[in-house]
Amino acid sequence: YSGSAMQFGDNLFLFYTGNVRDENWIRHPYQVGALLGKDGKITKIDKVLIDQPADSTDHFRDPQIFNFKGQYYAIVGGQDLEKKGFVRLYKAVDNDYTNWQAVGNLDFANDRTAYMMECPNLVFIGEQPVLLYCPQGLDKSVLDYDNIYPNMYKIGASFDPEKAQMVDVSQLHNLDYGFEAYATQAFNAPDGRALAVSWLGLPDVAYPSDRFDHQGTFSLVKELTIKDGKLYQYPVAAVQELRASEETFSNRAQTSNTYELELNLEANSQSEIVLLADKEGKGISINFDLVNGQVTVDRSQAGEQYAQEFGTTRSCPIDKHATTANIFIDNSVFEIFINKGEKVFSGRVFPHADQNGILIKSGKPTGTYYELDYGRKTNWCRKTCRRQPHYRLTGHQ
């Protein structure tokens, strides 16, 4: 199962969940570790770092290590004996990554309607803690969602590690309004920025690519910021270096299906565009309704269909003022960032061979079309990829 990593000296400490099945096929989860050296060799740490707690079922996984004011901590998602989800906070004794002591269950105003907390991540934006997590089975009366499992977040005013508490916690919010974002992993970079990557693929959902033994992919790397109490997520600036050419946004009979659109929409306007469009105008429909204040994404006519039991459209409310949209298309992936990350739609799509056009169906959206070269290395990667101190490992649950 998934985990995280942190640089210690010349080694990268890998922290993850290992599962052992006994003769009765009962699962025993262990939080274990390994060291990745500069030579690329992995040496496993020959002991269990965190055992399954006595008050937890065998659903106990996904450790995230983080540094808070010079002290190393970790959180692990779990399910208690009442089949309710929780997040447990641990402290590294003397900052020794092989010696972990439980502090207690993280207090984040847990409503206790979810049966499992998967992939919890605690990241800091300034002094404010942001908890990203996947509350499986969350009661929709708490917060409505459309996907089989949600990915959500809460923001705190501050963090008290001694009490395992996020202080003055916000309401629960959907992290992404699209079809696929899950298990979002976040960390603080050396310069303090909060960065995140989402897994675009949901557990217990069959995908068209399954027949090729492939499922899921990563989102773009996103920087997290807080504005007016809202969490914004927007691709890191280095992504702009993938822009190979630019043209004025317009109808296009054919594209490479690897591009970015930077659109402007006037206040109180209504516009609809179709991406991955065929000659009949069938593809991903994106409707910007700034009269009623709503954005709707419809993939019901985009390629091979799947997961239709969870719906083929997604919507979210937006203000009716002038709006921007940055849309990234990469063959089977789309990511839509409204107002520079105020609202986000992420999803997969498996278009037919002739679905590669752009159609402005109604309205007068303006902007720029950027052809993207995903094979380019950005300056950010050249500067940081060799010595990034904090990574996240992901795996299917």
Predicted regions and their residues:
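Beta-rich carbohydrate-recognition and catalytic domains
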Residues: Y1-D62, N67-T113, G126-Y177, L200-E246, ...
